[in-house]
Structure formats: structure tokens, C-alpha cells
Amino acid sequence: MVEWTDAERTAILGLWGKLNIDEIGPQALSRCLIVYPWTQRYFATFGNLSSPAAIMGNPKVAAHGRTVMGGLERAIKNMDNVKNTYAALSVMHSEKLHVDPDNFRLLADCITVCAAMKFGQAGFNADVQEAWQKFLAVVVSALCRQYH
């Protein structure tokens, strides 16, 4: 089980409270598909992913980005039990979708980049980043649990 300090909880919940999941989710998934094009193989049914403009304008990418952020909200609401919260999701991504677990870290990094761009130094300082990346590392670990 992960131990969260009061400062970490405050930073994570404070950042989450400012995030617009309808904005950050689509941006982060689009960024992941553009920067790491091999991740596109999991989204063959999403239609045109042939260029950055096509990816950024793709409604299925945007919808799945919002779904991802909805999943993160579950982790936010269950910060003391993320592994159990994500148990079924880990099984699905491992056994049904066969997603390479390294991709979870790549997407988490893209979420971090998008949040940092949105809020800049004033809203995403080193202390916030440290707590946020710890939180996302816990989420990634929980998603990878079935792979071990």
C-alpha cells in the first residue's frame, strides 16, 4: 500500500480539481498517439490516424481520452486502494486487449506534459509534479499488476 503525505494528497487533489478531463484526456491521448506512433496499433478501429491533424480531430480518440480520465478519477477517489480499484482493468488490458504495459507509462507521461503545459510553473511546480508523478506511477503499477 502506498503512503500519501498530507502535502501529496493536497497537491494531487488540487491539480485534479483544476483539470478539465474533457480537454486534458483527448490532448494527452492524441499526444501519445503522435509522439509514440506504435501505440496506434491498439486503436485500429478508430479510423483515420494518418497525421497529427487527423488524430487530434478524431472523435473516437477524444472519447477514449475522456474515458481514460474517467478511469483516473476512480483512482483519485480510491487513492488508498488503487490496486484493487484497477484489478479488472488490469486483467482486461492484459488478457483481452494485450496492451504492452510500457504504454501506460507513456500515456501517463503525456498526461503530465499536458497538465504542465496547461498550468505552467504557477500551477504545476516541482512539488505538484512530484506528487502527481507518484500518483500516476501508482496507477501505472496497478494497471501492470496482471502482467507480473
Swiss-Prot record:
Could you give one GO CC term from the UniProt record? hemoglobin complex
Biological source species:
Danio rerio (Zebrafish)
Question: This protein is called what?
Answer: Hemoglobin subunit beta-1
Positions that bind heme b: H64, H93
Q: Which GO terms describe its biological process?
A: cellular oxidant detoxification; hemopoiesis; hydrogen peroxide catabolic process; oxygen transport; response to hypoxia
Known function: Involved in oxygen transport from gills to the various peripheral tissues.
- Family named by the database record: Belongs to the globin family.
Q: Which Gene3D superfamilies match?
A: Globins
Where in the body, by tissue, does this protein show up?
Red blood cells.
Tell whether DNA repair is among the UniProt keywords: no
Keyword field: Heme, Iron, Metal-binding, Oxygen transport, Transport
Q: Which residue intervals define the domain Globin in the entry?
A: 3-148
Question: Which GO molecular function entries does the Swiss-Prot or TrEMBL record give?
Answer: heme binding; metal ion binding; oxygen binding; oxygen carrier activity
Q: How does it assemble?
A: Heterotetramer of two alpha chains and two beta chains.
